[in-house]
Amino acid sequence: MPIGALGTASAQDCPDIEVVFARGTNDAPGLGNIGGAFVDALRGKVGGRSVGAYAVNYPATFDFLQAAAGANDASGHIQYMVNNCPNTRLVLSGYSQGAGVIDVISAVPVPGIGFDNPLPPNVPEHVAAIAVFGNPSAKLGLPLTVSPVWGGRSIDLCNPGDPICDSAGDNVEAHRAYAGGPTNQAADFVAGLV
C-alpha cells in the first residue's frame, strides 16, 4: 500500500452520520450501555442513512483528569472525520465523565489539564448535534445548551435526582437510568438536526 494511502478514507468508508461517544466512569471500553442505547435509538430514527459509532479511547476511571486523554482522542477522531469524510454529519455524545470529555473539547467551561488537541475553527460546521447525559458541568450551571457555539444544537439531559448533574440530586440510581427514555429523547433531538 502506498504511504500516501494510509489514514485516508474513501467515500464508501464514510457514514452519513458518525457518533463520537465517550463512556462513563468504570464503563467497559466501547460505547457502554448508554452509548449503545443512544446509537441504536438514533439508527432507528434516521431512515436509510448510515450511522457509524466511534468509542472514545480513554481510561474512564476515577482519575477524572484522564478526561483530558479522552478529549485528545475524541478531538483526533473528529479531526480525522472532518478531513477524510467532510460530508459526514458528526454527533458528539457522552455519559457522565464522558459528558465531561465532550465539555472539554467544546470548551465548557475551559479546556482541561492535559488537553492539547483543540478542535480547529472549521469543525463546528461539521457537527450536527451534541447529546450528553448526566453531565457534571450541568451541576455547576454550565450545561452545553448555554454555549454560544453549540447551544442551539445541544441537548444536555439530567435525570431528576442525579447527583452528578442535579445540584439537589441524591439518587445514584437516577444517574444509571439514561438508557431508554432519555436516550430516545436525545435521538429524536439529534435526528431532527442531522
Regions inferred by a protein language model and the residue ranges of each:
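C-terminal region of N-terminal signal peptides and the immediate post-cleavage residues
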Residues: 2-17
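A broad, low-specificity signal marking well-ordered, structured residues that form hydrophobic/aromatic
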Residues: 9, 54, 155
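Active-site catalytic motif of lipid deacylating hydrolases and related acyltransferases
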Residues: 13-89, 160-183, 187-192
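Serine-dependent carboxylesterase/thioesterase catalytic core
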Residues: 72-151, 155, 164
